[in-house]
Regions:
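Flexible loop/turn connectors
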Residues: 15, 243-348
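Hydrophobic alpha-helical segments within soluble ligand-binding/sensing domains
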Residues: 168-197, 237-242, 296-317
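An alpha-beta-alpha
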Residues: 182-222, 322-339
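Periplasmic-binding protein-like
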Residues: 69-70, 127-137, 194-200, 227-231, ...
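Amphipathic helical "hinge" segments at domain boundaries
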Residues: 41-122, 129, 197, 201, ...
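Short, well-structured alpha-helical segments in soluble
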Residues: 113-129, 236-249
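N-terminal helix-turn-helix DNA-binding module of bacterial transcription factors
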Residues: 1-60, 348
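Flexible loop/hinge segments that line or gate small-molecule binding clefts
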Residues: 134-179, 281-292
Length: 348
């Protein structure tokens, strides 16, 4: 390919290489001409060319691409694969990285005998410039470390979700707050009159309390009769749910990660005949109830957005912990499934 470009532009292959990599030694006019000819010939950008052309559609493949490191946690190397939401994060990241001329390689932070210091050195010695931190797998509480102590001065870095408290990195997240409001609005439009929220405390911590914050905002507006006190359980127990349910008698439940769904099923309630159910992450409930109503978090778009942020930081030469971290929030979409129905519009 270098020879073809050199023949078309009338300069040496060395000059073509310098121009494609944005190095000194060629004039700006020559560089622009080389990039134009390269694009016409269907040259696939490696990350160096992406710095100059930002997002060329490719027609031919090259043997070598640059790597972005995906840092995962959990009990095993493949723990993250148990969750459809996280698989979609990674799928979205892979697809977007490929468009930029990168590939994504997983590095397990809990590898036996591995320290984060050593892992950072391994990534750096590989010439990897960009790091993506996947959501931390450990159950979160005030007693669990939520830090990733890597030498971030070596890399550009971004986080997917918001499970890491330190460092405060640029991150791509789902807009959990707006999704709760959207779920409440949709259930209200279906004429549900008493809508309850049931969450495991650790899961609400993973989103920094945004679900409960949004619910309480609407509770303040709509009143306690329509939105009873949320049931936030440090340790999910059926008896606690039964007491709460018997007291407030909701006709719809919002929950996530199959928690409220399992409570309703164990209680023997018909869904949606006796009570409606909406998930804050339909992918998380899909194993138990494949056609559940609720929020599609568009997790593949979150993963793609993380790569967008990371490649932009690499291209600008931004490494280390940012002084002012940036956030990209991706809105969810309501998915109407079989766990909710349109109810008669009766006066309460």
């Amino acid at each position: 390919m270098l020879r073809e470009i050199a023949d078309r532009t009338g300069i040496s292959r060395m000059a073509v290489s310098l121009a494609l990599r944005g190095k000194s030694g060629v004039s700006e006019t020559t560089r622009k001409n080389v990039l134009k000819v390269a694009q016409e010939l269907g040259y696939e950008p490696d990350p160096e060319v992406a710095r100059l052309l930002s997002h060329i559609r490719v027609k031919k493949s090259v043997d070598t691409k640059a790597c972005l490191a995906l840092l995962t946690s959990g009990a095993t190397h493949q723990s993250w694969k148990r969750y459809l939401t996280e698989r979609k994060y990674v799928e979205g990241a892979h697809a977007r990285a490929k468009e930029y001329g990168y590939y994504v390689e997983q590095f397990w932070m809990n590898e036996p005998g591995m320290t984060l210091s050593r892992l950072g050195n391994i990534i750096w010695s590989r010439g990897i410039e960009g790091v993506i931190i996947a959501p931390l797998q450990s159950k979160l509480s005030g007693k669990v470390s939520r830090s990733v102590r890597l030498d971030f001065n070596l890399f550009s870095a971004v986080e997917i979700s918001e499970t890491v408290e330190w460092p405060d990195l640029n991150r791509a997240v789902h807009d959990q707050y707006t999704s709760m409001l959207k779920a409440l609005d949709e259930l209200s439009a279906l004429n549900y009159k008493t809508i309850g929220l049931v969450l495991e405390e650790a899961l609400d911590l993973r989103v920094n309390g945004k679900w409960t914050a949004a619910y309480l905002r609407y509770r303040n507006q709509w009143g306690a009769k329509r939105l009873p006190p949320p049931l936030i359980l440090p340790f999910p127990k059926q008896p606690a749910f039964n007491r709460w349910f018997d007291h407030y008698r909701p006709d719809a439940i919002i929950s996530v990660d199959r928690l409220g769904l399992r409570f309703l099923i164990k209680r023997g309630l018909n869904i949606p005949g006796e009570v409606g159910y909406a998930s804050l992450d339909v992918d998380g409930d899909a194993e138990d109830y494949p056609d559940v109503s609720g929020i599609d978090q568009n997790s593949d778009i979150v993963g793609a957005a993380a790569v967008d942020m990371l490649v932009a930081a690499i291209n600008r030469g931004q490494r280390g912990i940012p002084v002012h971290a940036l956030r990209t929030e991706v809105e969810g979409s309501w998915r109407q499934g079989k766990s909710t129905v349109k109810k008669p519009n009766t006066v309460s």
